[in-house]
């Protein structure tokens, strides 16, 4: 009995506080070590039964250094009106609800993108601000490296760039934009790129920043791969994707050419001026009617 109690206290001393409830509930059996610490979370390797997985512990809002979080939260739907009002007022309850939405956004995005055919870690649930998910491994059974730690040949860079662009397209077709995609948020396993870190993923239709964020995501990835294959830098991939998306012509299987359609027709200045004059005339008429009614 004493030995069991002593063992429990040793486990508690070694285990991060936020992971203790998961151990007590049997969700996690053992914390194996810290994998990395980033701007919005700390990631641990954990044992869950016979499997080794990741436990992503989100940092409190006050400790997170993620810039301009409000831009990412725009358009996120809150079904409960009480929660929505509380979040607008900034009450403690509202802040707690905002935090819960931020933490659940990643697991929701992972499920959605996996169903859309995007290569992301398999999620196993989010428990009190801790996301349990698949640990991505390389062909030798080691933790998969990030893209920025891998040296590529020009051929491999072109191939992997095309793979990532296809995943960006599938994400957009599923209604999401990553919002923080770079060589630091892509892992490389024995199959190829795996996209990670999605708590800031945004609703492409509801967020006014979607186009700018998509362009930044694509630019980041193209610039990185372009170090190894400079010909990629000549492509207009972001504009091509968004152009097709706006037209309703983008599908999960769309193949990019890196070329955009440019309207070379001369501007019809006369028609534009007529529309402006008509608008002014309509406004003057409206003001005249208002004055007559006074």
Where would I find each of the regions flagged by the language model?
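Residue-level preference for long, well-ordered alpha-helices that form the structural scaffold
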Residues: 99-102, 127, 153-160, 210, ...
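Regulatory N- and C-terminal appendages and interdomain linkers associated
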Residues: 1-37, 155, 159, 163, ...
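Catalytic activation segment of kinase domains across protein kinase-like and atypical kinase folds
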Residues: 49-60, 146, 182-227
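Conserved ATP-binding subdomain of kinase catalytic cores across diverse folds
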Residues: 8-143, 173
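AlphaC helix of the protein kinase catalytic domain
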Residues: 142-152
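Catalytic-loop of the protein kinase fold
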Residues: 173-179, 183
């Amino acid at each position: 009995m004493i030995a069991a109690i002593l063992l429990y206290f040793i486990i508690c001393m070694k285990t991060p506080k936020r992971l203790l409830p998961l151990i007590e509930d049997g969700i996690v059996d053992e914390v194996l070590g810290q994998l990395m610490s980033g701007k919005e979370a700390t990631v641990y390797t954990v044992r869950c039964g016979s499997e080794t997985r990741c436990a992503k512990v989100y940092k409190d809002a006050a400790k997170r250094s993620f810039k301009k979080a409000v831009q990412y939260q725009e358009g996120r739907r809150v079904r409960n009106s009480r929660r929505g009002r509380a979040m607008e007022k900034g009450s403690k309850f509202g802040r707690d609800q905002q935090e819960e939405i931020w933490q659940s956004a990643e697991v929701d995005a992972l499920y959605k993108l996996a169903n859309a055919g995007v290569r992301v870690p398999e999620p196993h649930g989010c428990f009190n601000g801790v996301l349990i998910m698949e640990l991505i491994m390389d062909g030798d059974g080691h933790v998969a490296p990030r893209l920025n730690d891998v040296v590529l040949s020009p051929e491999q860079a072109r191939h992997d760039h095309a793979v990532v662009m296809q995943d960006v397209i599938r994400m957009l077709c599923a209604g999401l934009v990553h919002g923080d995609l770079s060589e630091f948020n892509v892992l490389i396993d024995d199959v190829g790129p795996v996209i990670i870190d999605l708590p800031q993923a945004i609703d492409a239709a509801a967020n006014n920043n979607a186009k700018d964020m998509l362009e930044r995501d694509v630019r980041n990835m193209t610039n990185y791969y372009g170090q190894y294959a400079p010909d990629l830098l000549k492509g207009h991939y972001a504009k091509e994707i968004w152009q097709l998306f706006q037209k309703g012509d983008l599908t999960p299987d769309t193949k990019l050419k890196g070329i955009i359609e440019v309207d070379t027709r001369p501007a019809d200045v006369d028609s534009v001026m007529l529309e402006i004059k008509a608008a002014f005339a309509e406004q003057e008429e409206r003001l005249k009617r208002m004055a007559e009614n006074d």
